[in-house]
Amino acid sequence: MDMSATPDRFAVVIDDESIILAGMEIMLDTWGYQVLAAEDVETVLAKLPGCPLPNVILSDYRLRDGWSGITAVRAVREACGVTVPAIILTGDTGAELMAAAKADQIRILHKPVQPNDLRRQIDSLIAVG
């Protein structure tokens, strides 16, 4: 990823399904975002130094190596030193997930998510963030 120019909009995307990750990256790119996309949290954390401050973090909930979307968002926020607006995309509807997301100020979107709905959610998070 070329970070030579600071983008107006920068997103971090984490999803361990490569096809979904690629689709999210292409979609965000068409919306004018520069994207740091990775299948695991460790890769994001390794590439994050030197990147612009993200406008938004998008993560799947169930990730590999024992990570969840909640812990991934926490790790990226800690690395950035600020509470970056975040959305977790999931099929899960459990009360534990909802409570953790609320406590960490993370928005939950249930799959399947339509692109226009995702864009509206991102725009509204950035507007208040």
Regions found by a protein language model. Give the residues of each.
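Two-component/phosphorelay signaling modules centered on CheY-like receiver
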Residues: 18-36
